[in-house]
Amino acid sequence: GNSAANGSTASGFECYPAVPGRTWHQESFYFAQLLAKGMQAVGASLRGRGGVRYIYYLENDQKQLVESTHTEVRAERSFTLLEDVNCPAVLAEQCFVTNEADVAQFGSEEGCKKTARVYYEAICAYFGTQPQAEQLAGFTLN
């Protein structure tokens, strides 16, 4: 999860795909959209426009958040884990640990299972496979 400064009311899900102009941008953006839609479906509020944003580091080491609607190619680097990879990559922050409502919704065992299911289904959708039904205590959940 993410954290915010004391007194902040920040909450919700956001994720960062590889930025425009990078080799894996399109694939990363597609996967980020799958994650955001899945998290919204289980009740997460989405930060920004649709929960998908880009982040850049400026010359003075300050971060700049940019909505995913801004698709111009920029020279600034993003997170290293999104830059120095040989595959699609997305950094996801599914909640704010400093927000009581986020923690209540996603900090429990049930919330973690819901989130894990979203990630699993997004991975299956990305690869074009059908997810297996979830098995819990002898019951099948879809």
Predicted regions and their residues:
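Active-site-proximal helix/loop segments of hydrolytic enzymes
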Residues: G1-N142
